[in-house]
Amino acid sequence: GPRCENPIELDIPVYITGMSFGALSYEAKTALARGATMAGSATCSGEGGMIPDERRYSEKWFYQCIQSRYGFNPHHAQLADGIEVFIGQGQKVGMGGHLMGQKVTDQVAEMRSLPAGIDQRSPARHPDWLGPDDLALKVQELRELTKNKVPIQLKLGAAKVYDDVRMAAKCDPDSIYLDGMEGSTGAGPHIAAANTGIPGIAGIREARRAL
């Protein structure tokens, strides 16, 4: 993130991607935070907002801005070491999310301002932008929110990689994260996970060509 005041440096070229509290338990989220810190890596909030203990145990922590905005809090964004704008996911490219009602506990429901025990569905696109020009404005908005102190990262699902990466690069983020089909999800239909997306390695080649 050379465009920001406090770029993130990792000891290893791997970090723990966004997995929401709800999809994962409190114990899993905090354990992953501790493990990432021990490994010199980072973790990400995923959808649904911030767990204070995850932030406490993560030396380097991304806060995710996702389509639904469930749990998104500007004050929590200012506590992050980086902001990740979720645009797509490798195993369900172009689709929204689905959290089963049995995982929407009282605590999860409170964080997301939703009724407990009811299935939660996320839309496929963000409500406040429709294309590349709007995305560039969103990146700038997040820079202003964080006072340009932390990197802004765009997360893309690997599909039309060449075109998508060219579009994302024009929005002037600090980094572009390409998610391949290998990444698992419990928030999409099996038919999409089994039959869509491309491998991350193949996507990297197209991303390099785009840049």
Locate predicted features:
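Glycine-rich phosphate/ribose-binding loops and adjacent secondary-structure elements
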Residues: 126-211
